[in-house]
Amino acid sequence: MKTNRQINRIRGLMDKYLEIVHSDRNKQNLKMWKEVGSWNRDKPRGFVPLKPNGHLPYVIELDISLWRKLTNDTNLVEYYSDPYTHMEFQLQRSLNHHQLYKDNFVFTDELYIWFGVITELSLFGSEVVWQEHKEGWIKEPILSSLEQVEKLTPPDFYKSGLMPKIHEFYQVMNEVADGKLKVLFPELARGPFCMAVHLRGISDLFCDVLVNPEGVHKLMRFIVDSEIEWTKERTRFTGEEPTRLKLFNDEIDCPSIGPQIYNDLIFPYEEELAKISGGVRYWHSCGNISAFLPKINKLPNLEVCHVGPWTSYEEADAIFGSKTALEICLHPVNDIVMADTGQMRSKLEDIINKCPHENYSVRADALMPQGDDLESQLSKIKEWEEIAREYFG
């Protein structure tokens, strides 16, 4: 049980944060995006960019492993286990972001509950290992063979995996927020293929794709049906309709898989979920998805597609045009931390020259601690921002 002093400290941070939310600078940043809807996890993204002042938006996002170093080395085990620390850290993180960077990040009057990319996997029985310095991860895959899919049971909205902790956080954070900030209940964001990879194990699943595709279809079917039912229960619990679909799929990468595998084993399930959800708000893979772009372009009402460092933004611009916005993410080491001024400038100019539809934002993301020289790394990020502000924002 936390003391009144600790709760008052959190509420003091809330007051400072709300000043940022209602600031003129934040209002100006809102104009840089077509719509800023609720984002039920960390790292808000998936927004369609606008160009109100002749410049497209850019965003800087440090990884949580780096943010913790800027908040007195917060122990992330505590952050993921204690709702008060969860609130305090994310508020302090936002205050630090506003102070450090002049990017087009938008602050909203909302708080999230987010335990990392393993959240959904825990619902299916994967055991989580927590770590002090970075996001938690899972132990071994729970499926030693595809025959075990028949024995899986759909996640219980209240009891499975991290759900009891999510409900605890939701209750406590709402009590502390006291109506000043809206606490968002999590939504499912991992794509079905991502889930399948980690429930079965990446090497085994890729072998299954070749020798037992029907078994893979059964696993995908189970995951999709489970996600649909979980989302229905979320609607009953919160009284809120789900937002448009988010599909995080870092495991979709070429040449790990080819276009035919995506077309046959993955796309049909993404399309099914998209039709139920009224479209796809955001499709994400950090892998090389250039070969999949023509098929991804056929997903209904796709608003934003992530274009990571290994995907051709030139091809993405040509394929999506003005229909779907691109979120172009730079390589955090090659394009920022280890880049010199000329390389930073050249990269941004290359994006501008090769994306004539001007339907994109630029994101410096996944910035993690690099060695012991933290000040030097932060200085390089600031240097990149100064250059980025000449072209964007």
Predicted regions and their residues:
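Residues forming anionic-ligand binding surfaces in small-molecule and nucleic-acid pockets
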Residues: 142-151
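Surface-exposed strand-loop-strand hairpins of Gram-negative outer-membrane beta-barrel proteins
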Residues: 72-86
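Catalytic domains of carbohydrate-active enzymes, especially glycoside hydrolases
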Residues: 88-112
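Active-site loop segments of alpha/beta catalytic cores
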Residues: 1-76, 104-112, 117, 127-138, ...
